[in-house]
Amino acid sequence: MKKRIALVTGGFSGEAVISYKSAITIDKNLDREKFDVYKIDINPNGWFYELADGAKTEIDKNDFSLLVNGKKINFDAVFIGMHGTPGEDGKLQGYFDTLKIPYTSCDAATSALTFNKRFTVAVAAFSGISVANSVVLIKNAFQSPDEVAGKLKFPVFVKPNNGGSSIGMSKVNKMSDEFGSAIEKAFREGSSPK
């Protein structure tokens, strides 16, 4: 009997665009002789499975199941193909742990830690791992790019603290207006609606 796999994609951040692309690749490479794959889109509007006719059916979050043609579908495992929150920050992992549904990726605690760059750097440094010099900026306490420029050697990479590694990331080669724009971009992308 084939295993039922939920391929989770989407997300609540700008990284959803990347998640959808990843899901296409994952979907193409899962062995259909072994697995029945259901692509589940999690986005700010809800959690859905799209039927062949284009109609969407909502996921029952009480047990992460869905109804297809009156038949309840429960999943044997989840393939997390989501970038950003809630797929990389431990939220989905914790949810699936609660439901005792196995999933790909690391556990909830590891996901939560590694999604936060500041915490990850602190734990790595405490463990004796060499880390690059970095400065964490707090949005409401941040005054200007000049206050941090002297603490860093250019070029620098500016990234959201609680985001992925692609959306909101900028490489800045020298102190300029570009540095301030990169910081603002990171602040925008680092905030998630849910």
Q: Model-found features: residue ranges?
A:
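Active-site nucleotide/adenylate-binding loops and adjacent lid/helix of ATP-dependent enzymes
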Residues: 5-9, 13, 21, 113-194
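ATP-binding N-terminal substructure of ATP-dependent carboxylate-amine bond-forming enzymes
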Residues: 1-109, 113-115, 119, 138-146
